Amino acid sequence: MARNELRPVIKLRSTAGTGFTYVTRKNRRNDPDRMTLRKYDPIARRHVDFREER
């Protein structure tokens, strides 16, 4: 398998509406659904949910 097929690069966009994004990789075999992580948003200055953007 090619490198990009199993662990694609995804963007995690803030749900606070600031437009801030994190970029990470995810394993499609373990997490086939859209990922949601609670991370720090420096624009909002608090922890918010970040959802996977395709």
UniProtKB/Swiss-Prot annotation:
PROSITE patterns assigned to the protein according to its UniProt record, in alphabetical order: RIBOSOMAL_L33
GO-annotated cellular components: cytosolic large ribosomal subunit
Superkingdom per UniProt: Bacteria
GO MF assignments: structural constituent of ribosome
GO BP of this protein: translation
One Pfam family linked to the record: Ribosomal_L33
Keyword Protein biosynthesis applies: no
Protein keywords: Ribonucleoprotein, Ribosomal protein
Protein family according to the UniProt entry: Belongs to the bacterial ribosomal protein bL33 family.
The protein, known as: Large ribosomal subunit protein bL33A
Species of the source: Streptomyces avermitilis (strain ATCC 31267 / DSM 46492 / JCM 5070 / NBRC 14893 / NCIMB 12804 / NRRL 8165 / MA-4680)
